[in-house]
Amino acid sequence: MDELKRTTTKRIKHFLSEPIILGASVSPSDYDEDGNYRYISMATIKSWKFDFDSANIVSDVYSESKSAKTVKKDDIILARSGECTIGKVALIEDEDLKGIFVDFTMRIRLKDYNPEFAYYYFRTTYFQYLIEIYKKGLGNNTNIFPIVVREFPLIDIPVYEQERIVAEIHAEINKQEKLKAGISDIQQQIDQIVEDCISQ
């Protein structure tokens, strides 16, 4: 925290386009396969991105009653509870996504800040450490709230510099994906060699 404070005097609250809010609760009767909205639960963001296919569909009646709890492109959804999930984030990248976020998450909408840069920052050891030391409760009953998160430091660098860093991250991710593909190819070759030996 002190190291971040030396880097920036700005807080998340200084870059919010609107207050951070918690999501909506749901009951089994609210699910409806004929609905148009996905329910963004903690389980759907546990892999650091929104898993569209695993998200339940809620009824249109429910969705209409929770219109203030919807998401749009560039929103960041932060899990606020659960021992293994608290602090995990997902960036909403689909402009056409219709979604309602769960009450155990919070929605962060930023202005004058690159949302993807913020997303990667929220994934850093620094930010996750802040979640760890400021969360309340024990085990799966741990929680953190918007009033706390809004006061966390946020790196204050020009947007063009944020974009440069995001591009650098993308390049590194692409390298990693190529390495993974190469390892997979080698594994297949090894499997084939072993299978050939067995079949002789």
Please give the residue ranges for each predicted region:
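A short beta-sheet element
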Residues: 41-42, 67-123
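Short, solvent-exposed alpha-helical surface patches in well-structured domains
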Residues: 117-120, 130, 151, 161-165
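Sequence-specific dsDNA recognition surfaces
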Residues: 13-29, 43-73
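Short coil/turn segments at secondary-structure boundaries
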Residues: 25-34, 133-135
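Non-catalytic DNA-recognition/assembly elements of restriction-modification systems
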Residues: 1-25, 158-200
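A short glycine-rich beta-alpha junction/loop motif
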Residues: 98-106, 136-163
